[in-house]
Amino acid sequence: MSRVEAAAAEVKVRQHNALYLLSALCMVFMTLVVAIQPLFLRNVLNISFETAGAVNANVQVVTEVLDLFIFAYLGYLSDRIGRVRIIVAGFLVAAIGAVIAPLSPWIGGASIGALVVYYVSRVIMSAGSGAVWPQLSALAGDFSDDDTRARLMSNTAFMMAFGVTLVYAVLMQIPAHAGIAVTMLLTAAVSLAGAWLAGKFLVDVAPRTQETSVPWRAVWSLVKAEPRLRLAFASSLFARSDMVFVGLFLMLWFIYFADLIKVGQAEAAARAGILIGLMGAVVMLSIPVWRSFIEHFGRIQAVLLGMVLSALGFIMLGFIINPFDWFIVLPILLIASGQAGCFVAPQILTVDYAPRDLLGSVLGAFNVIGCIGIIFFVQVGGFLFDYVGPPAPFVFTGVGNLIISAYALRLLKREARDGGGDDAPGDDGVA
């Protein structure tokens, strides 16, 4: 290898490592914001148990509605001007919202005003983070080819899972020692670090699109023509909401059940954090297994198995009354092991069939579908949490996962009957 080739290889490794680290930082930010929210609303803004599910769900839905509008456009814009500038700007915007959030009681004054300010801060944070993580996924696709895609995107997913694990296993212990405000301000520091790292080490490598507006028609034609892409989009509709469900409603369940058994709020949050941290660790550790599974058996098979495992775990949660009972570990482990496959395989399928100059736009549409799923499932879940009971949202989303499992099985049977395989197309096939 010549000196020039060695230098180029070193730069490539540095870019990949920066992508992995940024994936972790982005998930630390996004997860910590959601995890600290029930604790902040309960102990700082004094939101009552009776309205907890609706208020927490509404905050999440407001942010997802915003994401719904920005994902598609920013995906297209990244195809036009590059992804790195959008990532840097997104981290900076997220940092602004992260500074405002803990100050909402002082900025807003009365309880209703403080809640409005907090809503605004969450919208700002969502706009920022919504500009970051889809572009990181697109960069992982840009940096890969058919031979390296499963490995590179699995490594990126591994680091995202590591970020989630770090939040619930370590960072969610901070409120009990340093306070809620300090923990919330930590998200601003994480965002600023991400902006610096992205600007310093990431580069754009994808070709620029010549489209002058969001190419909805081209994306729709792709999805309509390719059944596997339809499965990927359908999986996004259900699977993206799953992780939000666990992060939001499980934390809610612990915090508000704590009042019934006379356990402190911070202790309950820490207990839930440990459990969700365990889930994140299982997701993280199982991703290499899923990468091997995808390489040996195929993307569709991974979606099918992942959805079945997650569905079993979610439905089992419906039989639990006390979340502090350690039996809850079993369904959480099933959800975690299934979610790792559901997180990686649909994204790989999407990148497989997206033209290189429209990858950002196709992933933008993929994420829009995920937002619709989150809005629907979180809104319904908040209603079920308040009026049916804390386990109800989990059973509801488990049924949704079973529906996608049935669709994936049908697709596999049809491909087996028609003699189709599960190989990814070459770049020429999607250009």
From Swiss-Prot:
Keyword Ion transport assigned: yes
Induction: First gene of the probable 18 gene mamAB operon.
Annotated compartments: Magnetosome membrane
Bilayer-crossing regions: 21-41, 57-77, 86-106, 107-127, 156-176, 178-198, 243-263, 274-294, 302-321, 358-378, 380-400
Pfam families tied to this protein: MFS_1
SUPFAM superfamilies linked: MFS general substrate transporter (SSF103473)
InterPro entries from the UniProt entry: MFS (IPR011701), MFS_dom (IPR020846), MFS_trans_sf (IPR036259), Tet-R_TetA/multi-R_MdtG-like (IPR001958)
Highest taxon of the lineage: Bacteria
UniProt topology in membrane: Multi-pass membrane protein
An annotated Gene Ontology molecular function: transmembrane transporter activity
Example of a GO cellular component annotation carried by this entry: magnetosome membrane
Biological role: Required for correct biomineralization of the magnetosome; probably transports some form of iron. Partially functionally redundant with MamZ.
Other remarks in the entry: This bacteria makes up to 20 cubo-octahedral magnetosomes of about 45 nm in diameter which contain membrane-bound crystals of magnetite (Fe(3)O(4)).
Family (UniProt): Belongs to the major facilitator superfamily.
The name this protein goes by in its record: Magnetosome protein MamH
Gene of this entry: mamH
